[in-house]
Amino acid sequence: MSVNVDATSSSGASEVRHDWTLAEVNALFAMPFNDLLFKAQCVHRAHFDPNYVQVSTLLSIKTGACPEDCKYCPQSARYDTGLEKERLMEIEKVIQRAREAKAAGSTRFCMGAAWRNPKERDMPYVTDMVREVKKLGLETCMTLGMLTREQAIALQQAGLDYYNHNLDTSPEFYGDIITTRTYQDRLNTLDAVREAGMNVCSGGIVGMGETGSDRSGLLMQLANLEHQPESVPINMLVKVKGTPMENVEDLDYFEFIRTIAVARIMMPKSFVRLSAGREAMNEQMQAMCFMAGANSIFYGCKLLTTSNPETHEDVMLFKKLGINAKQTREYSDEAHQAALLDEIQTNEAPQAPEMFYDATQKKPETVNI
């Protein structure tokens, strides 16, 4: 069977498709590595400045005790990971973290709660969080679990810019990872978010023991949505002791980079976020991910409950690569550069209290918020 994968043809570099077949996606993954990266870079340059990366900060506003059974997640109440449970964070503390994120160069502030879905009693608090963070001039994103259409509308009316709800993996592999909510439940939440008028952030996790065809299936599901997600986080599994996935075999790093590249080709106008798992990646691998089309990262020492490179390490890597973080609307060029220089100069300073428990550490730690 002959499959056309020339994504850099005159139409391929600008066309957003919603009719990808599994054979086409598998063929992209099977390309010689250098050819695949070249195609992905060409598509990337057709739609984005290749030397700019969007920067977000992720804060856990409610940690642990989640009733779901996602096998990768240390926040599930079903697994003994030593994670300290935390109630919904006070709005004042959230706003302080948002100010710190903006000072470090983030343009988007993402707030995550370990819920199956938000309760109605929680909605006034989370909508107030959105309004207050928006006042700082930051874009806002939330991940709160499944949403009803009414909840999605309430978040949109509060000013929420993005809602994150990952598909995680292919429909075929999904049942091996999660049983407490269906794939269709996830798609229904994405529909509710889109119909409410918000931007969609949706991606998945690789390295959970899935096949190459499952990685193709995940990207096919995302790309073939009626409207492709504006933001596509690609996570490398962070194995946490106590979860069912603590001993899963590592994914080859080249396969991860291929996943970034194929996502870029299939979703040419989406921001592809290099997300969880970056702490285990050296600078050279991260640089290859940027070459493959990743153009968004999270700043900060934690992603919810797992480690992330320190902010100053990202600043130094950007400097080496000639990459500039996408600036907040209020930042002038001079102010932005001053913020980056200040970050470099203070990277030896004593660290502020941790926002999150590090679920990848062997010994439990106390969460200081």
Swiss-Prot record:
Pathway: Cofactor biosynthesis; biotin biosynthesis; biotin from 7,8-diaminononanoate: step 2/2. It catalyses: (4R,5S)-dethiobiotin + (sulfur carrier)-SH + 2 reduced [2Fe-2S]-[ferredoxin] + 2 S-adenosyl-L-methionine = (sulfur carrier)-H + biotin + 2 5'-deoxyadenosine + 2 L-methionine + 2 oxidized [2Fe-2S]-[ferredoxin]. [4Fe-4S] cluster binds at residues 66, 70, 73. Its EC number is 2.8.1.6. Keywords: 2Fe-2S, 4Fe-4S, Biotin biosynthesis, Iron, Iron-sulfur, Metal-binding, S-adenosyl-L-methionine, Transferase. Binds 1 [4Fe-4S] cluster. The cluster is coordinated with 3 cysteines and an exchangeable S-adenosyl-L-methionine. Binds 1 [2Fe-2S] cluster. The cluster is coordinated with 3 cysteines and 1 arginine. NCBIfam families: bioB. Catalyzes the conversion of dethiobiotin (DTB) to biotin by the insertion of a sulfur atom into dethiobiotin via a radical-based mechanism. This is Biotin synthase.
